[in-house]
């Protein structure tokens, strides 16, 4: 992403997810330095069901930067606006030199804006979009230099028996759906990257060059698309570049911050979806792309579904992701996962 100059970041805390692992998995497969919170539970009075949740965040393993901090952070806020039926879960994946400061800033301000918005229950989608766009402007105007730093965000707002999902970037939310004797993964968000034809065309219309690193460096023909899809692509995905420079090189098409990338179509407007919960919905997962880089949504749901305790599900998914990272690369990304189980929900 390149170096940037810090204006003044001392007032912004480090990530609440501060695992300090100095190396890969321990011999028994357990993550070192992980930050896992106690089991949490929420009762939703209307329509009378329970949620049980856990979160785990693991700092990435970077051999060349052993002291690199965890740029992921997360937020679990119960009873927004004092309403026992409204709850918020979010994961924020920072990037760039000041990614940690960006992810913490956005985490705090998004939930504050939603909490203060009188239209939240009347029109959650409108409230979501307003919050992210306003936070983006606040970040630009803050003491944090976000010219080449920012954060993605995946958030879930529970409003009674409905969940509203707002996505900015390439983190993901997935719902586990019981279908007879199977548990199926239903994506609640869709990664906003140049792999998506609609997003690729949108940023190109804004002036972005969409090329892999090898293409930008002249190792491959820039006029021939060298990537197929996200699952089959190796370690050289399509990225966004200005017309006459080798920056910013973002692998996503939406984020909060990234002021420089806005000139080539990177936007902070979230895509918002809604699902009406039913007894067939068992749990949902909210996680950074550190989880999903090498694990498809169905594999994550299969793994989490084996465990009665969401703490165990978090640990298993994080450990498997960590292992797969090291099998494919000599490092791992930061990894953050929230699992929320849905219990005692009836059709009545």
Swiss-Prot record:
SMART domains, per database record: PP2Cc
EC number(s) for this protein? 3.1.3.16
Catalytic activity, reaction form: O-phospho-L-seryl-[protein] + H2O = L-seryl-[protein] + phosphate; O-phospho-L-threonyl-[protein] + H2O = L-threonyl-[protein] + phosphate
Q: Which UniProt keywords apply?
A: Hydrolase, Magnesium, Manganese, Metal-binding, Protein phosphatase
Q: Which residues cross the membrane?
A: none
Q: Where does Mn(2+) 2 bind?
A: 93, 289, 333
Binding positions (Mn(2+) 1): 93-94
Cofactor note as given: Binds 2 magnesium or manganese ions per subunit.
If you read the UniProt record, what top EC class would you report for this enzyme, in one word?
Answer: hydrolase
Fetch the PROSITE patterns from UniProt. Answer: PPM_1, PPM_2
Q: Where is the PPM-type phosphatase domain?
A: 52-342
GO function terms (MF aspect):
metal ion binding; protein serine/threonine phosphatase activity
User: Which Gene3D superfamilies does the record associate with it?
Assistant: PPM-type phosphatase domain (3.60.40.10)
Q: Which family does it belong to?
A: Belongs to the PP2C family.
The protein depicted here goes by the name: Probable protein phosphatase 2C 35
């Amino acid at each position: 992403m390149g170096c940037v100059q810090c204006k003044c970041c001392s007032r912004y805390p480090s990530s609440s997810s501060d695992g300090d692992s100095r190396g890969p998995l321990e011999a028994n497969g357990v993550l070192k330095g992980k930050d896992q919170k106690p089991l949490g539970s929420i009762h939703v009075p209307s329509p009378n069901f329970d949620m049980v949740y856990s979160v785990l965040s693991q700092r990435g393993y970077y051999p060349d930067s052993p002291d690199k901090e965890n740029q992921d952070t997360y937020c679990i806020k119960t009873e927004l606006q004092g309403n026992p039926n409204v709850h918020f879960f979010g994961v924020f994946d920072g990037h760039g030199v000041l990614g940690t400061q960006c992810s913490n800033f956005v985490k705090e301000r998004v939930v504050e804006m939603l909490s203060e918005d009188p239209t939240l229950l009347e029109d959650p989608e409108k409230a979501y979009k307003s919050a992210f766009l306003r936070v983006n402007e606040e970040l630009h105007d803050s003491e944090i230099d976000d010219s080449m730093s920012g954060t993605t965000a995946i958030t879930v707002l529970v409003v009674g028996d409905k969940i509203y999902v707002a996505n900015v970037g390439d983190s993901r939310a997935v719902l586990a759906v019981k279908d007879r004797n199977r548990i199926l993964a239903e994506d609640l968000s869709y990664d906003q990257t140049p792999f998506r034809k609609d997003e690729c065309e949108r940023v190109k219309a804004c002036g972005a060059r969409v090329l892999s690193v090898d293409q930008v460096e002249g190792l491959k023909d820039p006029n021939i698309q060298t990537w197929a899809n996200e699952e089959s692509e190796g370690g050289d995905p399509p990225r966004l570049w200005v017309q006459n420079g080798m920056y910013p090189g973002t692998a996503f098409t939406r984020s909060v911050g990234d002021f420089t990338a806005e000139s080539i179509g990177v936007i902070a407007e979230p895509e918002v979806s809604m699902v009406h919960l039913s007894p067939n919905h068992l749990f949902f997962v909210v996680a950074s792309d550190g989880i999903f880089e090498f694990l498809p949504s169905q594999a994550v749901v299969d793994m989490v579904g084996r465990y009665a305790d969401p703490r165990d599900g978090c640990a298993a998914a994080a450990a498997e992701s960590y292992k797969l990272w090291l099998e494919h690369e000599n490092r791992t990304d930061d990894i953050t996962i929230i699992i929320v189980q849905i219990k005692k929900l009836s059709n009545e």
